[in-house]
Every structure is written in structure tokens, then in C-alpha cells.
A protein has these predicted regions:
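A polyanion-binding, active-site-adjacent surface
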Residues: 2-218
């Protein structure tokens, strides 16, 4: 059994079908922004007091990964473990995300950058307020400007609705290419949701295949 088949089986996706990929063509990697362009942004995020979330956070969760990535994954807001560790998508949800990436031939930190709409954890994991989103959005936009991803994957209802300024359900947003900040965007379920709703893992695999095909056509 191939590694991808093993990963898909671990995700609970059956039957396992083969993902067709085009032969990889080696091209020179584009040079990203100088490292010093990230320094003021990271400092601005870590010291941000623009909304009340700075009073209850343990630390900010800036984002992690390849700063020259083609793929950018955007989640909702940090949870308790993310707030404690300072990294997005950790714990069980993070392990599931790693399996999801492996299923389409990707891995965390290699041509993938992961961030959240919000950089601070809302108390009790409540949904962020419009004011909190408005204050934090410039940080995310600056990350996108520096990374210049070719494709964004919005993970979860809140992230998708916020980025697309829509109140539509994930079901109605899936399977289409949207745009955010000029970048093609695809919507799928959040890994934490999939831990509670196993039957939607197969739909997420469909989204990942669609994302891979979309990236191949860019």
C-alpha cells in the first residue's frame, strides 16, 4: 500500500482512489521578500493591543511555514493549545491537517504556510467579533503580500465567511474558486470540525483534490 493510501486510510476515507498528478517540472524558486520585511510585522503582531484579546492571550500565534510558499492555509483563530504553544494547528487537529497535506503530497513548512484570521485566542474559543477581525485583518493581508501564495485554502466556516465577506454555508462555497486579496481561494472544512464529524472527511478529500488540480492549472 502506498504512503498516500495509508494516510487516507488513517483519515477514514474509503474507498481510497488514486490522485493523478502531473510530472513535476523543476523551476527556479522565486526569491521571497528580504527577512527584514518580516521583522517589523512579527513585532507588530506580538505587541498588538488594538483589541481586547491582548488582555487574555498567553501569546500571539503569528503563523508558521515556508515564507516563499505557493500554498497558504488560513484557519479561524487560535485555540487553547495554539495559545499555549504559539503555533497554529497543533494537537489532534494539527495531526489531522498534517495527514491531509501528506495525502496531496505536501508537508507543513515545505511550500506551505499556515496562519489564522486572528492572531490571538478569543476567550472560551468563541467566534471573533467584527471589531477583532477588522483590527487583525491588516496583519493577515501583510502576510499574504509578503508570501505571495499562488493558492489560499480557507479552513472552516468562520475563516471562509470572513475572507469572502459572505454568510453562505461551507456546503455552498465548496467546489468553486473564489478570490481573496487577488489570490485564488478554495474552501474546505476545518480539521477540528472533522474530528467531530467523521462523515465529512471524504468531502474534504474532494476539496483537496480540487485544490491540487486548481494549483496545477495556475
Amino acid at each position: 500500500m502506498s504512503r498516500r493510501a495509508v494516510v487516507l486510510a488513517e483519515m477514514g476515507i474509503k474507498p481510497v482512489w488514486k490522485l493523478r498528478t502531473k510530472p513535476r517540472v523543476e523551476t527556479p524558486s522565486p526569491s521571497g521578500p528580504p527577512a527584514n520585511e518580516w521583522i517589523p510585522l512579527k513585532a507588530a503582531v506580538s505587541g498588538c493591543t488594538k483589541c481586547g484579546l491582548h488582555k487574555t492571550r498567553t501569546q500571539t500565534v503569528f503563523g508558521v511555514g515556508d515564507e516563499n510558499a505557493d500554498w497558504m492555509l488560513i484557519g479561524e483563530a487560535p485555540g487553547a493549545e495554539e495559545d499555549r504553544l504559539g503555533d497554529p494547528f497543533v494537537g489532534q487537529a494539527g495531526r489531522l491537517l498534517d495527514n491531509m497535506l501528506a495525502a496531496i503530497g505536501l508537508s507543513r513548512g515545505k511550500n506551505v504556510y499556515i496562519a489564522n484570521v486572528l492572531k490571538c485566542r478569543p476567550p472560551g474559543n468563541r467566534n471573533p467579533t467584527p471589531e477583532e477581525v477588522a483590527q487583525c485583518s491588516p496583519h493577515l493581508l501583510k502576510q499574504i503580500e509578503l508570501i505571495k501564495p499562488r493558492l489560499i485554502v480557507a479552513m472552516g466556516r468562520f475563516a471562509a465567511q470572513t475572507l469572502l465577506e459572505s454568510d453562505s454555508s461551507i456546503a455552498s462555497l465548496r467546489g468553486r474558486v473564489h478570490r481573496y486579496a487577488g489570490v485564488p481561494l478554495i474552501v474546505t472544512y476545518h480539521p477540528a470540525y472533522l474530528l467531530r464529524t467523521l462523515e465529512d472527511k471524504a468531502k474534504t478529500w474532494e476539496d483537496l483534490v480540487f485544490a491540487r488540480k486548481t494549483m496545477a492549472g495556475l
